[in-house]
Regions:
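Conserved PLP-enzyme active-site core in the AAT-like
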Residues: 2-55, 61, 70-94, 98-288
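Short glycine/proline- and acidic residue-enriched helix-loop micro-motifs
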Residues: 67
Length: 288
């Protein structure tokens, strides 16, 4: 039997949390009018709303904040960030933002216009908001099995190729790009298979459409591929990650998820036209 190793880190800092009584919780819920979003964070023992920005950062990350170059232009911190992103993803053009929804705002300000249709797999709420706020339509093309909560299949986050093809057949001139969320957050954080990503790429290429990944949990998706998809057991997460991103034209990223930082995000792409078109909106919304 193969035994698991201990975690590869030491914990240097702890934050105390308080375990409440049932009577207290009942009172707090009553005071919040039974709207859990009105509870105070200190009243919640285990918060299951999101993991976003809640991961513990390493000593090197905290030290990096003290050593970071905050120059308005030409900051060395940017070039370090760019080198890492390009090494991991293969994307050449990088636009940093303060979080994932900001990356969507910057990129969609260039790509999405009134009357457009953006097909994908269960758009995340901010993604849908940025699309529909521009009087466009976020078209859900997720497989039907994703809604069957008792069904267990390896990749319930997949795009339905038939739904995607139908959308492109009927509305090709109104579709600026196809978006794939990895993992599929809105559908329970379910993963997307490499085979499905290949199918999406092939369909998009058939109609001359670019593919964008919402990549907040790309490393988790790569892990699921390694564990569940045939032919990937002996590949590293980095190898699987590069193979995934080779099937996309660009990505938006909330680094507060698989980047395991408390704040941050970015746009990365291999398309110079996306970069040139979006960077002006970055100055407008996010800074130089």
């Amino acid at each position: 039997m193969e035994l698991p190793f201990a975690e590869a880190w030491k914990i240097k800092m702890v934050e105390p949390i308080r375990k409440s009584t049932r009577q207290e919780r009942e009172q707090w819920l009553k005071e919040a009018h039974y709207n859990v979003f009105q509870l105070k964070s200190e009243q919640v023992y285990i918060d299951l709303i999101t993991d976003s920005g809640t991961g513990a950062m390493s000593d090197r990350q905290w030290a990096g904040m003290m050593l970071g170059d905050e120059s308005y232009a030409g900051a060395t911190s940017f070039f370090k960030l760019k080198e890492v992103i390009t090494r991991l993803t293969g994307f050449e053009y990088i636009i940093p933002t303060h979080q994932g929804r900001a990356a969507e705002n910057v990129l969609f300000s260039y790509l999405v216009h009134e009357g457009d249709i953006v097909p994908g797999n269960s758009h995340f709420d901010t993604t849908k908001g940025h699309i529909e706020g521009r009087r466009a339509l976020a078209l859900d093309c997720t497989i039907d099995e994703a809604k069957q909560t008792q069904l267990e299949i390896p990749f319930k986050g997949n795009v339905d190729p038939k739904k995607l093809e139908k959308a492109l057949q009927e509305h090709s001139e109104r579709i600026p790009f196809v978006i794939v969320t990895i993992t599929n957050n809105t559908a329970g954080g379910q993963p997307v298979s490499m085979q499905n990503l290949r199918e999406v790429r092939a369909i998009a290429d058939k109609y001359g459409k670019p593919v964008l990944f919402d990549s907040a949990r790309f490393a988790e998706n790569a892990y699921f591929i390694k564990m569940r998809e045939e032919g990937y057991r002996n590949k590293s997460i980095k190898e699987i990650t590069r193979e995934m991103f080779d099937l996309a034209d660009g990505m938006t990223m909330s680094a507060k998820k698989d980047g395991i930082v408390n704040m941050g995000g970015f746009i990365a792409t291999r398309r110079k036209d996306w970069y040139e078109g979006a960077k002006g909106f970055c100055v407008q919304f996010e800074g130089y």
